[in-house]
Amino acid sequence: MPELPEVETVRRGLAPAMVGARFARVTLRRPNLRFPFPERFAERLEGTTVRELARRAKYLTAHLDSGESLILHLGMSGRFDVRMPDGSNLSPGDFYLEGALGTPKHDHVVMAFANGATVTYNDARRFGFMDLVATRDLETCRHFAAMGVEPLSDALDGAVLARLFARKITPLKAALLDQRLIAGLGNIYVCEALHRSGLHPALPAGALAKPDGAPTPKAKKLVKEIKAVLTEAVAAGGSTLRDYARPDGERGAFQHGFRVYDRVGHACPTKGCTGRIGRIVQGGRSTFFCETCQVR
């Protein structure tokens, strides 16, 4: 599933085609994706103009001049093919790293804009979805109401992390993946941030808070590394694994800089460490870490 850097990369790729553009025609080629489309979905979009294309955690939100916002979630394999007004295609060739999962038969939503651009949503597995909600109710809607802080925002610092994790015996990695606490972190970047911080993924999350609730030095370092990993990943265009690629069809490059993710048996890249990268399973997901320098 695309994580925060991949979704942010998609947002940046879609913005030139969508921001300031008016929906001329919306074609639905099936009645549902993961969920049924909202009532009168196409009708409510047609004639409206996109004022802003934003991101909340792993979701895209297009704020419309009608007072509603279009929520877009990519699911496991969702992608957008963009055809610009000049006829250039921002998604040429094979979108996927391992085979063309997204064939034209999986083009489920076609959004034609008055400026001549066309954005097509393709989703082979149909785990993605679209919704329309009043913009004023966006933060309290069912998708976002229980969502935690944005990891790249100023709302997350060492003190906030300590407050969120205080007295929790939950394994640190599981706490970081809890979208009710911090919204947008996923398996890849949590593994990478924990390694950079020298923290074991099974460490109790509460260990990052002092008895008085203040953040430990490790809590502050972890926040710093989370922000650094995400920022670097966005700059690299995300990570291409199986189902994710950028809107222009190019593959994200951050996977070439993985220190631990999917590198079992490799030497730890930390200077002075003689350890190897190992793997454990937590919550049904693979966790990659250095068996020597990531301490409990």
From Swiss-Prot:
One of its GO terms (biological process) is base-excision repair. InterPro entries: DNA_glyclase/AP_lyase_DNA-bd (IPR015886), Formamido-pyr_DNA_Glyclase (IPR020629), FPG_cat (IPR012319), MutM-like_N-ter (IPR035937), Ribosomal_uS13-like_H2TH (IPR010979), Znf_DNA_glyclase/AP_lyase (IPR000214). It comes from the Bacteria. A zinc finger (FPG-type) spans 259-295. Pfam families: Fapy_DNA_glyco, H2TH. Its cofactor is Zn(2+). One of its GO terms (molecular function) is class I DNA-(apurinic or apyrimidinic site) endonuclease activity. It catalyses: Hydrolysis of DNA containing ring-opened 7-methylguanine residues, releasing 2,6-diamino-4-hydroxy-5-(N-methyl)formamidopyrimidine; 2'-deoxyribonucleotide-(2'-deoxyribose 5'-phosphate)-2'-deoxyribonucleotide-DNA = a 3'-end 2'-deoxyribonucleotide-(2,3-dehydro-2,3-deoxyribose 5'-phosphate)-DNA + a 5'-end 5'-phospho-2'-deoxyribonucleoside-DNA + H(+). DNA binds at H106, R125, K168. Belongs to the FPG family. Involved in base excision repair of DNA damaged by oxidation or by mutagenic agents. Acts as a DNA glycosylase that recognizes and removes damaged bases. Has a preference for oxidized purines, such as 7,8-dihydro-8-oxoguanine (8-oxoG). Has AP (apurinic/apyrimidinic) lyase activity and introduces nicks in the DNA strand. Cleaves the DNA backbone by beta-delta elimination to generate a single-strand break at the site of the removed base with both 3'- and 5'-phosphates. Monomer. PANTHER family: FORMAMIDOPYRIMIDINE-DNA GLYCOSYLASE. This is Formamidopyrimidine-DNA glycosylase. It comes from Methylorubrum populi (strain ATCC BAA-705 / NCIMB 13946 / BJ001) (Methylobacterium populi).
